[in-house]
Amino acid sequence: MQGSVTEFLKPHLVDIEQVSPTHAKVILEPLERGFGHTLGNALRRILLSSMPGCAVTEVEIDGVLHEYSSKEGVQEDILEVLLNLKGLAVKVQNKDDVFLTLNKSGIGPVVAADITHDGDVEIVNPEHVICHLTDENASINMRIRVQRGRGYVPASARVHAQDEERPIGRLLVDACYSPVDRIAYNVEAARVEQRTDLDKLVIELETNGAIDPEEAIRRAATILAEQLDAFVDLRDVRQPEVKEEKPEFDPILLRPVDDLELTVRSANCLKAETIHYIGDLVQRTEVELLKTPNLGKKSLTEIKDVLASRGLSLGMRLENWPPASIAED
């Protein structure tokens, strides 16, 4: 095996040992030292927490108002019935939300095969026991809601404000969407030619039958690869935030006093005092303006009224006045 000292080995030997339709052992080698644990732990976490699937989320049972009760003629209490329903393995095609019905009477076990469903639904474990009827006259009728999701979602996390009006008797069930029942991995030593410091990754996986183990690992690897894609072409795609600069002064203060359309007498008096901009004017006080030659109380009242109509007044304090644009003029 020849190659660059910086070149990473890629696993090329994959052995799949099918223990049963729902149980398989996958062996991957050779891997660079340390990569067995790196990849094994990442795949294990995804398989346990992030695999999509279908699960029972709500149940309505005739004659049952809450989960802390029992039903006449049924051997198990309602909590145990709900626990058994959580073990239902369901595959749903083309839908994210379906309702199933179960109607059974007479002595004997009630199993998943007794559930009525349409062609888009497949119950993988039809022999799964839901409860037992103990009397010839006993019966059980229920409506089961199955939804698509990911990982594990407790019933408490699916209670929203609008669910306060949920009908009495509709029982929420903790949803275990993941089709993976058990996952474990082990890292063993591997050898390629003269190299003895390599890893062999052994993954042992069991599912509920809704997905075969090989497909589960394939999907988990796809999820991991898609998440890592962002690092392959790493760059900051955020647009630089453009800070909107606020003007130092209200634009109206930068306008000439002529824009106030004062009488000729008042305008001339202001110009004589070198008051050219509205910003110059609002900084003056009434006392200062009354000292202006030929500007009397009538003109002062006119100026105050015009400023007030624009939300301004005399005696205002303006920091850093005049601005550079005016000072240069």
From Swiss-Prot:
* Top-level lineage group: Bacteria
Q: Which residues cross the membrane?
A: none
GO BP: any one term:
DNA-templated transcription
Q: Which family does it belong to?
A: Belongs to the RNA polymerase alpha chain family.
Q: Which GO terms describe its molecular function?
A: DNA binding; DNA-directed RNA polymerase activity; protein dimerization activity
Which Pfam family name is an example for this entry? RNA_pol_A_CTD
What SUPFAM superfamilies does this protein map onto? C-terminal domain of RNA polymerase alpha subunit, Insert subdomain of RNA polymerase alpha subunit, RBP11-like subunits of RNA polymerase
Protein EC: 2.7.7.6
This chain belongs to the protein called: DNA-directed RNA polymerase subunit alpha
Q: Catalysed reaction per UniProt?
A: RNA(n) + a ribonucleoside 5'-triphosphate = RNA(n+1) + diphosphate
Question: What's its job?
Answer: DNA-dependent RNA polymerase catalyzes the transcription of DNA into RNA using the four ribonucleoside triphosphates as substrates.
Region (Alpha C-terminal domain (alpha-CTD)), start-end ranges: 249-329
The UniProt comment on domains reads: The N-terminal domain is essential for RNAP assembly and basal transcription, whereas the C-terminal domain is involved in interaction with transcriptional regulators and with upstream promoter elements.
Q: Which keywords appear in this protein's UniProt record, sorted alphabetically? A: DNA-directed RNA polymerase, Nucleotidyltransferase, Transcription, Transferase
Q: How does it assemble?
A: Homodimer. The RNAP catalytic core consists of 2 alpha, 1 beta, 1 beta' and 1 omega subunit. When a sigma factor is associated with the core the holoenzyme is formed, which can initiate transcription.
Segments carrying the region annotation (Alpha N-terminal domain (alpha-NTD)) are 1-235
Q: Which Gene3D superfamilies match?
A: 5' to 3' exonuclease, C-terminal subdomain, DNA-directed RNA polymerase, insert domain, RNA polymerase, RBP11-like subunit
Instruction: Look up the record and report any one GO term of the cellular component aspect.
Output: DNA-directed RNA polymerase complex
